[in-house]
A protein has these predicted regions:
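Short coil-to-helix segment of the ABC ATPase nucleotide-binding domain corresponding to the Q-loop/switch region
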Residues: 89-98
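ABC ATPase NBD coupling module
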Residues: 53, 65-80, 101, 106, ...
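Hydrophobic anchor residue at the start of the ABC signature
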Residues: 143
Length: 216
């Protein structure tokens, strides 16, 4: 069930955003894409998610041509650095939204949402409005929504960058526990960061990118 990127090139202007990227990601592992701002991290994640089409190259997942699969059919979840939630919905409704879109069984939705809420430490916050939550809590909602989907690929684009130091430290530790647990052993986790110390603390494989090219 590995995710394989082969010779991915994306050059929308006179500069490469992705320059001949070839990578292999295995399930049950945490990968950190480390690079400065505008190094190509977000572009790489968006390409995997299907939000951006490369000029050339290929992506294979589960022995299928991933580039040929529409975005809405890819089993991918993405957490952004901005707190992206549905402001008109409460915490529980935010988390269950993608499951209802899939028309899943209500009992299964209830269980998956309850499990996700428990994992991110939001038990008791189910009826809270998004506007009533702190930045850290809002990011937990976004993470819980991704976990409830049970996506096979979870992409995290600098998810802690807009939080204060104490919140970053706490959530980083929770990420490590979540992504190394047995329940998530079949998923691939790719985390983008500009911070070398954060990359080391996450205890995963570190991939360095600069000017759209993999350095190590």
């Amino acid at each position: 069930m590995s995710l394989n990127l082969g010779n991915i090139i994306f050059k929308p202007t006179d500069q490469y955003h992705l320059n001949d990227i070839s990578l292999n990601f295995e399930p049950g592992k945490m990968y950190t894409i480390l690079g400065r701002t505008l190094s190509g991290k977000t572009t790489l994640l968006k390409t995997i998610a299907g939000l951006q089409t490369p000029d050339s190259g290929n992506i294979q997942f589960e022995d299928k041509d991933f580039l040929a699969i529409p975005v809405w059919e890819r089993n991918v979840a993405m957490v952004y650095q901005q707190f992206i939630n549905y402001p008109h919905l409460n915490v529980k409704q935010n988390i269950e939204f993608p499951l209802k879109q899939r028309k899943m069984d209500p009992d299964i939705i209830e269980k998956e949402v309850s499990d996700a809420i428990q994992k991110v430490g939001l038990k008791g916050f189910e009826a809270r409005k998004i506007q009533e939550l702190s930045g850290g809590q809002q990011q937990r909602v976004a993470l819980a929504r991704s976990l409830a989907k049970k996506a096979k690929i979870l992409l995290l684009d600098e998810p802690l960058v807009n939080l204060d130091y104490k919140l970053r430290e706490g959530l980083r530790e929770e990420f490590k526990k979540l992504f190394t647990g047995s329940e998530t052993s079949q998923s691939i986790f790719i985390y983008a960061s500009t911070d070398p110390l954060e990359a080391m603390q996450l205890n995963g494989d570190i991939i360095v990118i600069d000017e759209g090219k993999i350095l190590q």
